[in-house]
Amino acid sequence: MNVDAEASMAVISLLFLAVMYVVHHPLMVSDRMDLDTLARSRQLEKRMSEEMRLLEMEFEERKRAAEQRQKAENFWTGDTSSDQLVLGKKDMGWPFQADGQEGPLGWMLGNLWNTGLFCLFLVFELLRQNMQHEPAFDSSSEEEEEEVRVVPVTSYNWLTDFPSQEALDSFYKHYVQNAIRDLPCTCEFVESFVDDLIEACRVLSRQEAHPQLEDCLGIGAAFEKWGTLHETQKFDILVPIVPPQGTMFVLEMRDPALGRRCGCVLVESECVCKREKLLGDVLCLVHHHRDPSAVLGKCSSSIKAALCTGFHLDVCKTVQWFRNMMGNAWALVAHKYDFKLSLPPSTTSCKLRLDYRSGRFLSIHLVLGVQREDTLVYLVSQAPDQEQLTSVDWPESFVACEHLFLKLVGRFAPENTCHLKCLQIILSLRQHQSLPHGASRPILTSYHFKTALMHLLLRLPLTDWAHNMLSQRLQDILWFLGRGLQQRSLHHFLIGNNFLPLTIPIPKTFRNAEPVNLFQHLVLNPKAHSQAVEEFQNLLTQVKTLPHAPLAAAP
């Protein structure tokens, strides 16, 4: 009877845990597991292990208590022939047994109240699971006079008719691959051409106390190899600048809590002896001068007069100086090339337009940057479209860090991965997407989709991005961004990301900082959130109809 009682209680415990597992982890029709399901399953495994451990401890405690009672009764009755507890005897009582009943059946009949509560708990859990499977975008606002009606988008209903692997491959080859066939060679030419201009600028500014130009760095979609047809004619180049001898740049960062990540570049005088070690007993003529500040002032007076507002480097003045340098440099190297170069006006970047005789043209945007310490974080001259900054504010840019991250992924990932193809397919569809009625510009940008991709590249093994997983990974990116829209939350990839590889050189304060929400403006502006949801829904419609209809140009 002892063995039967223990076996019965073990069976009941296992049945209880099995029911709990089915309730908390229902099997879906699809064989794919999203990130939330994976996290819930791991939490459930831990909870089940903890519950099993508690049940075993409770059983052992009850068993010891029963043994103590048996010994005490044997002592008072004089029966000391055996000190072992025989479970299941009516006079001794089974720990999980009601009076007058024997075995597990008696326990069930004697604890109808607990059984009823357990059934109510099961019903509640089933209802809760059904409610959780129907998330919807809430884009209504009490402040708006006219309520905006948005069709809910769940995380399951639109995945059922998602395009197949073959349909996505066909679309990619027809609309993306053919358009970017010559993109790698064009990127290589653009970088070499800009380097040629920069070398000519160095020759022209050798005798001037102006900022020095470093080697350029190709950034953006074209150079990160996720460019589409729209990016094949537009190229972004970062040109770092450093102070001339006798001058130093001091970066004064503004408080990020104010909502803007930017800083000012303070121009100060600096003696060369602080940078270079003087040999032997050579004396510094500046610091041994009666008035060192007067000598140092002459070294930085020209740059302050030409490029500064007050004591800070002015974005517009610096870009205009750089634009003039590019024009003079072109005069030195024009004989090498067979196209016409023009410089369209711009206040935050130096734009170059290359017109060929065939009618083809290339647009190059040269963005100036001041490096922050020994990292790949720069203060750049070009601000995002939605930000309004003063002429001495230089926005903070992580584009070089992101460029390095994607480069490392391409180096260590298996051959022919699909992570860039996913982004190219999404952006190719968005380029042919009409804006919602009354909208002047889109809310969702290519940077939002790129951020979602980079987050998933850290969460999923690189082997999960094989070519035959294109359809699944494309669904993951759309699901990730859709959930972010629903929650009005999309964290910046680099700021506050503890999972970022240490090979990405960013300041330690950024790793330990609070995450930055790229969708914060959607929290403050319900109308913008409604537009973003509509844009996302239109994109889903385009993806689902991908195999059946050709692309049409947006008006």
From Swiss-Prot:
It comes from Homo sapiens. The chain crosses the membrane at residues 104-124. Expressed in testis and tumoral cells. It is found in: Cell membrane. Residues 38-74 form a coiled coil. Keywords: Cell membrane, Coiled coil, Membrane, Signal, Transmembrane, Transmembrane helix. It is a single-pass type I membrane protein. Belongs to the ITPRIP family. GO terms for biological process: calcium ion import; negative regulation of T cell receptor signaling pathway; T cell differentiation. GO terms for cellular component: membrane; plasma membrane. The keyword Hydrolase does not apply. Residues 1-24 form the signal peptide. The keyword Cell membrane applies. Gene3D superfamilies: 1.10.1410.40. Residues 25-103 are extracellular. This is Inositol 1,4,5-trisphosphate receptor-interacting protein-like 1. InterPro entries: ITPRIP-like, Mab-21_HhH/H2TH-like, MAB21L/cGLR. Functions as a ligand of CD3E, inhibiting TCR-CD3 complex signaling to regulate T cell activation. Induces stable CD3E-NCK1 binding, thereby preventing the CD3E-ZAP70 interaction and subsequently inhibiting the activation of the downstream ERK-NFkB signaling cascade and calcium influx. One of its GO terms (molecular function) is receptor ligand activity. Residues 125-555 are cytoplasmic.
